[in-house]
Amino acid sequence: MIFKVFYQKDNTRSPRRETTEALYLDLDVATKEEGVILARELLAKNTAYHVEFIDSLSDESVEYEKETGVFEITSF
């Protein structure tokens, strides 16, 4: 299941929409809830990012992201 994570690189400042970035994680989980938990654990362990929101992507959403933006799976 692929998840899109919205985050701020600087966790010492209040989040601002203009500086929100995104990354994509491909996680082997059974449910969306398990994926959100695992994603938060991975990000806490490997980054100092301020995570704003994590959402699972449908196959259609993944195709859209590939066509319109920079789609690259992040691995830790």
From Swiss-Prot:
What InterPro entries does UniProt report for this protein, alphabetically? RpoY (IPR009907)
Give the EC number: 2.7.7.6
Catalysed reactions, semicolon-separated = RNA(n) + a ribonucleoside 5'-triphosphate = RNA(n+1) + diphosphate
Q: Which GO terms describe its cellular component?
A: DNA-directed RNA polymerase complex
Molecular functions (GO terms): DNA binding; DNA-directed RNA polymerase activity
This protein's UniProt keywords:
DNA-directed RNA polymerase, Nucleotidyltransferase, Transcription, Transferase
Q: Which Pfam families match?
A: RpoY
Q: Among the record's GO biological process terms, what is one?
A: DNA-templated transcription
Give the family per the record: Belongs to the RNA polymerase subunit epsilon family.
Q: What does this protein do?
A: A non-essential component of RNA polymerase (RNAP).
Q: Subunit info?
A: RNAP is composed of a core of 2 alpha, a beta and a beta' subunit. The core is associated with a delta subunit, and at least one of epsilon or omega. When a sigma factor is associated with the core the holoenzyme is formed, which can initiate transcription.
Recorded protein name is DNA-directed RNA polymerase subunit epsilon
Query: What is the protein's species of origin?
Result: Lactococcus lactis subsp. lactis (strain IL1403) (Streptococcus lactis)
List the top taxonomic levels of the source.
Bacteria, Bacillati, Bacillota, Bacilli, Lactobacillales
What gene name is given for the protein in this entry? rpoY
